[in-house]
């Protein structure tokens, strides 16, 4: 991994080869203080958002190419139909041995050579693909401690289409059916040859930082992590390209969810130019193909907002529930084995107990069909995550919810023992 010369940055040394190559360095080994957060690049403000809010639109030009930026003078755009470019060596994708029950979770079809970002036959992907990438570029995991951004996220149930009162039960029923179809494999990390749970946690921690810097919605973060996990459930990725996959995931999620998504060039910049714009766009294209362009997925955040609307609580409990739910993103194991609706219910229960000394109201039990006994296993895991987060090196979520706009809920100490028996 590349070093960075910024005074405010912390760079991980190059990754070695051999049996210890998959081990992650902690901040203690690097001589860092625990409160500092891990970021994979230097971040900037969302200039596009300010331009769009502060200026009138003067001219609209039509062109083929990136939807975020106008093409530079003389730069090639997408070729016309029927005109192909010479084949170039790109990403090789190989077929894995199929497993029982895996066909529904990976929508691809056959092994292909991903030769050009614009020329791909979408009928050729197959389930259980392995993505074998060159290990010639390593992601720089850098910290920019000067970046202090606040999320614009504010609960506005009145404009949330998921919480339309007249159709709340039908919407919830549909989301419960959809979450089963779009869940990642619970233990996919066991089949990843070159990445670990710790590497994924560092990446998710960085995605939280990116979301805060560019003032992205919380739902954008949840979508990005969902895209990442579904992709890794089907593809084996070398660690040198893991950040590229994560960057493409949040780029795609921001295009889907945000009104003013950051430019592609911004996402290239936050990786410290480790990857080129072309590489990022190619990875975005591959991500779409592996996900079969299925981007509308239920998340824990959506279910939690439904529960908060159905059974209102004080603003402190609401913010604490959001904080607890977001902690579940850091760990693929054990939380991927629980459905998002169940994780949201556990987050609601834990926050409600910490603040109000009550767990699961009868109204939500009737609305969701979940009893407290069904929620207890996930609730126990979330409780452990809350107790351990002050001692973890990944502090982005905790720092985010230390802000006054969230009433400093991440500083609240949960009880050591929950009366669950």
Curated annotation (Swiss-Prot):
Pfam families listed in its UniProt record: Cyclin_C (PF02984), Cyclin_N (PF00134), Cyclin_N2 (PF16500)
Keyword Cell cycle tagged: yes
Free-text description of this protein's post-translational modifications in UniProt: Polyubiquitinated via 'Lys-11'-linked ubiquitin by the anaphase-promoting complex (APC/C), leading to its degradation by the proteasome. Deubiquitinated and stabilized by USP37 enables entry into S phase. Ubiquitinated during the G1 phase by the SCF(FBXO31) complex, leading to its proteasomal degradation.
InterPro entries for the chain: Cyclin (IPR039361), Cyclin-A_N (IPR032447), Cyclin-like_dom (IPR013763), Cyclin-like_sf (IPR036915), Cyclin_C-dom (IPR004367), Cyclin_N (IPR006671), Cyclins_cyclin-box (IPR048258)
Subcellular location: Nucleus
Intrachain S-S bonds: none
Residue ranges of the region described as Disordered: 1-20
GO molecular function, one term: cyclin-dependent protein serine/threonine kinase regulator activity
Alphabetical UniProt keywords: Cell cycle, Cell division, Cyclin, Mitosis, Nucleus, Ubl conjugation
GO biological process, one term: cell division
GO terms under cellular component: cyclin A1-CDK2 complex; cyclin A2-CDK2 complex; cytoplasm; microtubule organizing center; nucleus
Complex formation: Interacts with the CDK2 and the CDC2 protein kinases to form a serine/threonine kinase holoenzyme complex. The cyclin subunit imparts substrate specificity to the complex. Does not bind CDK4 and CDK5 (in vitro). The cyclin A1-CDK2 complex interacts with transcription factor E2F-1 and RB proteins. Found in a complex with CDK2, CABLES1 and CCNE1. Interacts with INCA1 and KLHDC9.
Function: May be involved in the control of the cell cycle at the G1/S (start) and G2/M (mitosis) transitions. May primarily function in the control of the germline meiotic cell cycle and additionally in the control of mitotic cell cycle in some somatic cells.
Stated family: Belongs to the cyclin family. Cyclin AB subfamily.
Stored PANTHER family: CYCLINS (PTHR10177)
Name of protein: Cyclin-A1
Source organism phylogeny: Eukaryota, Metazoa, Chordata, Craniata, Vertebrata
Name of the gene encoding the protein in the UniProt record: Ccna1
